[in-house]
Amino acid sequence: MNKNGSKFSMDTIISFSAIIIATASIFVAVWQGYETRKHNRLSVRPKLQISYSVDEERFGYILINNGLGPATITEIKIFIDGKEMINPGFSGYDELIDKLNFSNRRKAHSSLNPGTTIKAGETKNIILVNIEKDDNLDELLPTIYQRIGMEITYISMYNEEFIYTFPN
């Protein structure tokens, strides 16, 4: 006992208080590091989306990165009438257009292959086909859009994998 009748001296109380504060500080630092890491991952997370594109001259699909960071495509699958196209690389888009009976039209497509990186805010044409004068778009477009499906697997800068399926 000390001179005040307490079991603990002032030095002992101060020492225990310092240990408690140091332990709490370590906990807060670890938690803050975890939250910062989580924030950093979210601040560069890509978000790919496929949208219809129709104007006076062409119709088709475009790929948009609406996220905050770049997306690197690791795999792309294209389906027509529910069946996956084998090897839908650069020439696969021409095969898709042929299966839709548009081989005689002017067309454009991007080369979206594994390894393609799409930066934040960037838009890529997937497939665009020219509209002809005698096309009835009210019948043509829904038919085409119902026949095509896509699944794109991509990664972020942190190698987090995401899969986007269209239509959702």
Give residue spans per PLM region:
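Amphipathic, hydrophobic N-terminal targeting peptides for secretion and organelle import
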Residues: M1-N2, I14
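Hydrophobic membrane-insertion alpha-helices, especially the h-region
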Residues: S15-A29
